[in-house]
């Protein structure tokens, strides 16, 4: 069954790669290129999963995640944060604001696909 996945990232090459991978996995994909448009897309489309970059213009991934977790209507949306920031404090902050999982860039597409399947199955 096809799931709705929102890719929220401002880096074009990452978006192309993630979009290809998620479509290959059979998901319906939409894209947001900054924090405010990501939040708007989450509120209107209610995706099953958001691949959320931490460092984006307008609002950070942390701020977007916090806003989503503060909205009961969006409780079912899974969030996988993606970031080049891999320090323990960054990971703890991402999970602390409500992300379901956190992966650091660069990541293997195999690991990402497995994590997405795991999150969508739960």
Report each predicted region and the residues it spans.
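Receiver (REC) domain active-site loop signature in two-component systems and cognate sites
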Residues: 56
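C-terminal output helix
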Residues: 107-116
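Active-site beta3 strand of CheY-like receiver
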Residues: 45-51
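Short hydrophobic/Thr-rich beta-strand motif most characteristic of the beta2 strand and flanking loop
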Residues: 26-33, 41
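Conserved Asp/Asn-Gly motif in the active-site loop of CheY-like receiver
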Residues: 32-36, 91
């Amino acid at each position: 069954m096809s799931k709705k996945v929102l890719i929220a990232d401002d880096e074009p090459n990452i978006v192309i790669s993630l979009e290809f991978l998620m479509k290959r996995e059979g998901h319906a994909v939409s894209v947001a290129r900054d924090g405010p448009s990501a939040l708007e897309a989450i509120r209107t489309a209610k995706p099953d999963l958001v691949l959320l970059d931490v460092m984006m213009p307008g609002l950070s991934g942390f701020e977007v995640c916090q806003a989503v977790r503060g909205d009961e209507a969006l409780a079912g949306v899974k969030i996988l944060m993606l970031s080049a920031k891999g320090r323990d404090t960054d990971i703890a902050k991402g999970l602390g604001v409500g992300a379901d999982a956190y992966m650091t860039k660069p990541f293997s597409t195999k690991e990402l696909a497995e994590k997405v399947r795991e999150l969508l199955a739960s």
